[in-house]
Amino acid sequence: MKFFQEKISIKETNILLKVDNPKFFKMAKNTIINERLNLENYILRNPIFLTSYSPVEVPDNAPEIIKLMAEAGFNADVGPMAAVAGTFSQLIIENLIENDCKNAISENGGDICLKCEMDTTVGLYAGNSSLSGNLGFKLKKEKMKNGYGICTSSGTVGHSVSLGNADSITVFSKSAIIADAAATSIGNFAVGNAVDAINKCLEKAETISKIDGVFVCMGEHAGKIGKIPQLIKTDKKEVLGNVFEMV
């Protein structure tokens, strides 16, 4: 299976997109442009949507992207912008599926939505943790039939806001939007020594609906809750976005 890859950067949105046909790159760019316009225009009129760390009510006539992000915020008890990266990955894949794309992976700063017709391994990137680059999650093709979300939050890697210090909180869900907000929310509980922090994260994860499972990595320690894909050894020291294998 041959994949075509392109990095798409439009303002703050930086997507690594892999597709089975290069014609889908233009569609993805149009999706980003249109949805960014909806988001930016709404924020101009409602700046609290951008700055709030708590869930924000939005009207029924708000753009779909706004309602999706707000829903994810309420589901995980965080501000709607906690879901922004996963939202763009999700909307890109949904649009490509509607246009008969069979295989596509959209990665936006560690927040992934993918649809593949064969089993796929996604690598774990967890900063300086010894587990980083050595573990991957093997997803079955049946799980990705309508798109699937794998989103990671970190208190030690990247520029996203996290109140905790876990190396990685990876959340699995049918929705990358829900998964992104959940990862941020769970990551905020990663405080204290590694074992205690991981337990706090897993306890928080139990309170969040619409997610399949969570994998938490902190230093030499890790924990999981719920149903996560099969863990496999990868032996690859690469950033998460570059570790995709069709198996």
Swiss-Prot record:
Protein name: UPF0280 protein MMP1236
NCBIfam families noted in UniProt: PRK04334.1-1
Family: Belongs to the UPF0280 family.
Coiled coil: none
